[in-house]
Amino acid sequence: MKCTIVGATGYAAIELIRLIELHPHLEIVSLISDSQTNQEMNDLYSFMNNKQFPVLTAFSLEQIEAVETDLLFLATPSGISTKYLKQLDDWKGTVIDLSGDLRLEKSLYEKWYPHESVDTVLQKKATYGLTEWKREQIKDSRLIANPGCYATAVLLGLLPLLEERVIDPSQIIIHASSGLSGAGKTLTEQTHHVRSSENVRLYKMNQHQHIPEIESIAEDITGQQITVSLATYLVPLNRGIMATMTLQPLVEKTEAEWRTWFIEKYKQESFIRVGQTDPEIKSAAGSNYCDISVYLDTRTGRLTVVSVLDNMQKGAAGQAIQNANVIGGYPETLGLTQQPFFI
């Protein structure tokens, strides 16, 4: 498939480029950046010097069609994707949007995001791209709302439990930490090295835009209404997310039984690994894996589920490629089998 990336100079786009270069059936034919028009990617990023990429151009539907694009990735920030989505509504190719602009219905979006919502009719055309749980719908979709990074980590840990009605849906407490790439490429005081190095910072307490995404998608998939408390932290890492979910189980199982239960639930999934060792971000960084660990506190009776993934891969570009594989009829793991960096 011939691919165009819009917002080609951002972190998620760079990861997309890296993954597409590893994919035997995906080819980059156009790179779009309204802010860096007419520049070369290898002038902006020295690690690309050994490759020849298309010159960056401004967004143009005519150009996208001229290079015979089959698959377009929107790697633009929320609020920016919306203006492109309007122009792409009648386009015949496939769009995978990595922003949050298609994930929520209008009233929720405008409550949690500081932007005007995309058209309701257009939003309803989109399929939520949590691959392991929406695979059949993704196959036939031409408009994908790629999930958020925190939402991916949390939903992969929660959905098996919610589907079986084995936890209290009103007692879900989540603490989630993200590497700095999750804050995007634009420099802020909070992501400045002096402020972020040797520091852990709480941000958007109970106000993160992935809260309604988690709640609405959980209800859509399982039919069960949930409420979550979410505390999010920036930690001095380049990439990675660890989400720790404290839950109240409604059935009695031992820790070993809960772990076996999760293994059974995800036994067919190539990118979900249920482990017996304590989780760490390094075990997933640089890969499309999500590692899940399960703990039971016999003193309080509470269940803790920990999900670890790479926010740039499984939480963004990797999941987008996974969805592209599903749409293209390719093996789901194609181009995504690289092991974690670890060191």
From Swiss-Prot:
Its EC number is 1.2.1.38. SUPFAM superfamilies: Glyceraldehyde-3-phosphate dehydrogenase-like, C-terminal domain (SSF55347), NAD(P)-binding Rossmann-fold domains (SSF51735). Pfam families: Semialdhyde_dh, Semialdhyde_dhC_1. The keyword Cytoplasm applies. Its main location: cytoplasm. It is an enzyme of class 1 (oxidoreductase). It is found in: Cytoplasm. One of its GO terms (molecular function) is N-acetyl-gamma-glutamyl-phosphate reductase activity. GO terms for cellular component: cytoplasm. HAMAP family: ArgC_type1 (MF_00150). Belongs to the NAGSA dehydrogenase family. Type 1 subfamily. PANTHER family: N-ACETYL-GAMMA-GLUTAMYL-PHOSPHATE REDUCTASE, CHLOROPLASTIC-RELATED, N-ACETYL-GAMMA-GLUTAMYL-PHOSPHATE REDUCTASE, CHLOROPLASTIC-RELATED-RELATED. This is N-acetyl-gamma-glutamyl-phosphate reductase. It comes from Exiguobacterium sibiricum (strain DSM 17290 / CCUG 55495 / CIP 109462 / JCM 13490 / 255-15).
